[in-house]
């Protein structure tokens, strides 16, 4: 399993070399695995309880980012992309027979991101916030304007999962520059590039 908010403090503490200071830049993006963990417990755990836990984890993330920023480095934090728009989420609508699954995932992401963002120190100096969720939503809604030909399917072939996927192992018609998703959950180089422009 991938890292979650609860693992962030140890990751920061494990940074090699001198302590992070005011001449350093820390880029922080975490939360996808928290959202997936919460979603996996549905419907055994109800929607309201899951949303409450997403908010709790978002607040914890915001608090950790604040602690990092107060230690000296400039911090750029990215919200969790809207996972409700991923190929994974769209497939969940079909495989579960419940067409509201992707909307639930989007709601969990929104609850997490909203609580995280309001927890951040907002003085315009310590922390920069990149709205990855809104960027993904815009890319899906206005795909042609962003030069995207496909925003619903994964570009990587199933037999060439990340990180082994390359431009030679894409599904037919896919390109790294015109498909939004690399796999069922992760952005392609095109999607990552757009986040980089925002940061």
Where are each of the predicted segments found?
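Alpha/beta-hydrolase superfamily serine-hydrolase fold, recognizing
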Residues: 17-20, 107, 124, 190-193
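Structural recognition of the beta-strand scaffold that forms the well-ordered cores
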Residues: 24-30, 34-37, 69, 74-79, ...
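Conserved SGNH/GDSL esterase-like catalytic core that processes O-acyl groups on lipids
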Residues: 1-63
